Regions:
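Alpha-helical transmembrane segments of multi-pass membrane proteins
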Residues: 4-16, 20, 50-54, 111-112, ...
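Hydrophobic alpha-helical transmembrane segments
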Residues: 14, 18, 61, 88-92, ...
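Short cytosolic juxtamembrane segments of multi-pass membrane proteins
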Residues: 211-226
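Transmembrane alpha-helix signature in integral membrane proteins
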Residues: 4-37, 205
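Hydrophobic alpha-helical segments of membrane proteins
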Residues: 18, 22, 26, 30, ...
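Generic hydrophobic transmembrane alpha-helix motif, especially the helices
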Residues: 23-27, 37, 42, 46-110, ...
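Glycine-rich helix-loop "coupling/hinge" segments at transmembrane-helix boundaries
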Residues: 65-69, 81-82, 94, 151-201, ...
């Protein structure tokens, strides 16, 4: 049934997008926070590492890993459902290659906030670096992190759809919007509904997430409230 598989494929695509971006948020926040707070040599090393990861082509890596390793991983249980191992591969690759811009955002926030008076007061009363990083500075840096993470979900969904359309992403019997599109390739004229609905939902989902991200940026940016 086309409707059932489209709905099921949407769940997979959204799970991949959200899970990959959560992984990217964790890695990017940790790297950016440590680099921005400590500065100096630590900052230089972490930023050079970030630049190296940034130069890794995400789609090329997804294609190569999907081609040679996705089928070797057994099915997994996630959120009460069974998925092919290719889902886990895509989540990990997207998550580990999408954190670089988040790290730069977090670093810039920490470089600015660590010199504020409330941080100086926390140091004066003997607060250690860990609580300052995660309890004092991080909550004040959440607005741009939330916005960047929201927009990153849309990018992750598009990346999954791209590699799945090439037949190297999510593998059957697990459905995703990307492999629904490739399965309808031979029926473009005779059964257009097979590709119209997955393609339309990908477009609407990505547009909706981008609108949410823009709205969050406007709502959380204090400069727009002046």
């Amino acid at each position: 049934d086309v409707m059932a598989r489209t709905i099921s494929g949407g769940q997979i695509s959204l799970i991949i997008g959200v899970s990959a971006m959560l992984m990217a948020l964790v890695v990017g926040t940790l790297v950016g926070a440590i680099a921005g707070y400590y500065g100096g040599g630590i900052d230089s090393v972490l930023m050079r590492f970030t630049e190296a990861v940034f130069n890794i082509p995400q789609l090329f890596l997804l294609i190569v890993i999907g081609k040679f390793f996705a089928m070797e991983i057994s099915s997994i249980e996630l959120f009460g459902r069974t998925f092919s191992g290719s889902v886990l591969v895509i989540i990990i690759i997207i998550g580990l290659t999408s954190w670089t811009y988040l790290a730069r955002i977090v670093r810039s926030q920490y470089l600015s906030l660590k010199e504020r008076d409330f941080i100086s007061a926390a140091r004066a009363i003997g607060t250690s670096n860990g609580p300052i990083i995660f309890r004092h500075i991080l909550p004040n840096s959440m607005a741009p992190i939330i916005v960047a993470g929201t927009l990153g979900v849309a990018s992750a969904i598009l990346a999954e759809a791209y590699v799945s359309f090439l037949g190297l992403g999510v593998q059957p019997p697990t459905a995703s919007w990307g492999n629904l599109l490739v399965s309808s390739y031979n029926y473009l004229q005779t059964a257009p509904w097979l590709w119209i609905f997955p393609g339309l939902l990908i477009s609407l989902t990505v547009l909706s997430i981008n609108f949410v991200g823009d709205g969050l940026r406007d709502a959380l940016d204090p400069r727009t409230q002046i």
